Amino acid sequence: MRNVRLFRALLGVDKRTVIEDIEFEEDDAGDGARVIARVRPRSAVLRRCGRCGRKASWYDRGAGLRQWRSLDWGTVEVFLEAEAPRVNCPTHGPTVVAVPWARHHAGHTYAFDDTVAWLAVACSKTAVCELMRIAWRTVGAIVARVWADTEKRIDRFANLRRIGIDEISYKRHHRYLTVVVDHDSGRLVWAAPGHDKATLGLFFDALGAERAAQITHVSADAADWIADVVTERCPDAIQCADPFHVVAWATEALDVERRRAWNDARAIARTEPKWGRGRPGKNAAPRPGRERARRLKGARYALWKNPEDLTERQSAKLAWIAKTDPRLYRAYLLKESLRHVFSVKGEEGKQALDRWISWAQRCRIPVFVELAARIKRHRVAIDAALDHGLSQGLIESTNTKIRLLTRIAFGFRSPQALIALAMLTLAGHRPTLPGRHNHPQISQ
């Protein structure tokens, strides 16, 4: 066939593919056209298992002729057409034969898959589907195939020393992913559906005992299910509790105390006389309980925010709380003091934490007394975070990016496609466009 090199380049195939014929088909209406290239593998790559690439004996003709979608030529769709017999693999049994232009179980060529994967990482959902003329679910399947191929060529657990572990909700009804990041490279290392001991155990199974022993630091949110697995699988690693989550415990305790004060004010308001319709008269009885409940309800953000971030109005609310409710203001000071502990860090931070625990135990606020006991239970991990300066900041930023990908990936059939998209985007192995690299080859 003439111009073989030209057609190989246009079709995105290599010398292992024989191009027998190329036809141009146009429908009667004239509003659609297709190019069909009839191809076959060279004898050197014939009769190989599509799953493992090993040579195998002939089994049957399979489903006969098959077509694989290739990249468009301008506005014309292009397909590769070839026989798809089956071989009898010693490992996998009857399996469709491997072809050098496409992945196993794929309806698209390497070039098409790689282009779609690059677009899925770099473009919007609408742009990918409109440009490539495929459904979004098809994009999910392609992304999963490309990541599976990429994963075989890389060692994502190489030089893993300091890791962060967290969970993220990816779907309603409490559907979670467990994610692991590398603190040194800043990359996503591993993700899987679920957030329990069994799920995290899968990570350490994939990592292996030898590499697990090389992990020196693990940061987490002090969840028991993470701490238990880490203690069992890499007992020599230093576990660090995330400072943000510890301060969040104090913020939650402060909000419990605010709601208590608000409910007390509402109870007083229920005993106060009710006003009739319209503007109250000059001689109407005051209702301080109702006014106090209203102001406490609106004070949540003034209590939550850092002092340097308060607006003028929120600062006024905080000053009002300090004057009218010493107990609630004391709870606020406890929260801010705990935040200060993690801003100083090191030995000074540990001494400040000792003083904070002593104060919280004597503060006569039950929720903060309980918080002091909780912090004492996790004291070793908190001290490690103060000593080594390790936090979940990196993994929280990764989670934010995964949440964005979750919205993009809406419509994928399974979480595996979402995980594949996240790995291609955040694991440091982003796909490249065909022609910019050597695409994966079947072993010979």
Swiss-Prot record:
GO MF assignments: DNA binding
Gene Ontology cellular component annotations, sorted alphabetically: peptidoglycan-based cell wall; plasma membrane
Keyword Transmembrane helix tagged: no
Region entry Disordered, spans: 273-292
Cross-referenced InterPro entries: Transpos_ISL3, Transposase_DDE, Transposase_HTH, Transposase_Znf
Full protein name: Transposase for insertion sequence element IS1557
Pfam families: DDE_Tnp_ISL3 (PF01610), HTH_Tnp_ISL3 (PF13542), Zn_ribbon_ISL3 (PF14690)
Protein family membership: Belongs to the transposase 12 family.
Keyword terms of this UniProt record: DNA recombination, DNA-binding, Transposable element, Transposition
GO biological process: DNA recombination; transposition
